Structure formats: C-alpha cells, structure tokens
C-alpha cells in the first residue's frame, strides 16, 4: 500500500511512517466536522522530509537538527512504535548513499516496533532469508522475489520512485550483486535529483571499477565529475 504524498519530495520509503501520520492531512479537505490533524503529526512529517532532503544534499548539520526536532514532536505522544518507524525511515535514506552503519535509533526501540517495521529493518539490513515479501513496500517485491542476479538488478532499475530505486541498488551492492548498469542507473538517479551525497558515493564506486579495469578515459571523466561536485573543478 502506497501512502498519499502531499509534498514534492518523494516519501514512498516512509510508507509505514506516513501511513499513520500523513494520512491525517487528508481530513483537511473533507467534512468540516472532521477535526484537523494534530500539529505534532504535520510537524513530524515535515521534519522527516527535511532531514531526508538535507542528508541527500549532503548537509549533515541540518539533518541532525531536523531529526532532533522530529524526535521531540513524536516523543510528545509517548508512541515508541512511531518513533521507531521514523528512525527506520531515516536509516533507509542513509542506505541510498551506501551508508550501511547500524540503525542504532531503530535498534534501541525495536522491542516496541511493529512486526512490519521489524520486517522492513531486516530488509534494509539485507537479511532476506525467509522474509515475507508482503510485509514490505510493494516497489521492492519484484526485486526480492528474483533469485537470478540479472533479473533482480532489472527489477531494481525499474522501480519508479527515485529514493527506493537507490535503496534497492544499494542493497544489491551490499550483497555483491549489483551490476555495472545498476550502478550507472544509481548515478543517473542521484544526478537527476541533485542529490549530492549519494551521487558522490556512487561515482566513487564507478571510479573504483574503472581503476580496476585500467580504463584511463573513464577514470578521468569520472574524476572531473567528482571535482565539479566538490567545487574543485579547474576553471576554463
């Protein structure tokens, strides 16, 4: 089930979190007798979006601040399960940049997390053995169902939403299954969105491969792109 999205930034990765929080916004256009959603819901969703966008753009300070404020908003409810859900969404965004560090924020709350959240956490940790596909966001179903590497890569590249597409590519990379075409697709996705952090990371992956092949032209071209992003490009 794909949650409704009320903002320009892709939020399908937050399917579990927004299913509970953002759906409240839909009542604003309904009957006048329906009370508006509480402020904490709207604030938490907005802050999570801000944290994700800041991370993807490479602004760690803004990410940290937005996550801190988001946690404060959710803490007002006493809902540990919702906080765990939000932490998981934040970790999923980091994975798009090949950051596979433990999801400490979720792990400390996992005992109170919903079963579906725990399944998603396993998916993000690439622990797929015996994982129930139906418990996960629908856009990952085809990739997870494929045992053949080529078909799994194709399924990942066909994911329509950019952030889940990057996450799928990252998880294939983590398991050593990502094909060069999937790495190229990840670069194209991050570039098109202007997501500096994952773009740099995926370009480094491609640069490493070019080095291993001794492809001097590819190495030079990739380094020029990296230098441009880092502001180190030589003036004309």
Where are these regions (language model features)?
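C-terminal motif of bacterial Sec signal peptides marking the signal peptidase cleavage site
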Residues: 27-30
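Residues that mark the junctions of alpha-helical repeat units in TPR/alpha-solenoid scaffolds
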Residues: 36, 43, 83, 179, ...
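Hydrophobic/aromatic side-chain positions at a characteristic register within alpha-helices
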Residues: 36, 55-58, 75, 175-178, ...
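N-terminal Sec/ER secretory leader and immediately downstream segment
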Residues: 36-113
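Generic helix N-cap/helix-start motif at coil->alpha-helix transitions
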Residues: 40-52, 80, 158-167, 196-201, ...
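Structural register within alpha-helical repeat arrays
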Residues: 50, 90, 167-170, 186, ...
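Extended amphipathic alpha-helical interaction segments
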Residues: 116-195
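A cross-kingdom marker for long, charged
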Residues: 203-236
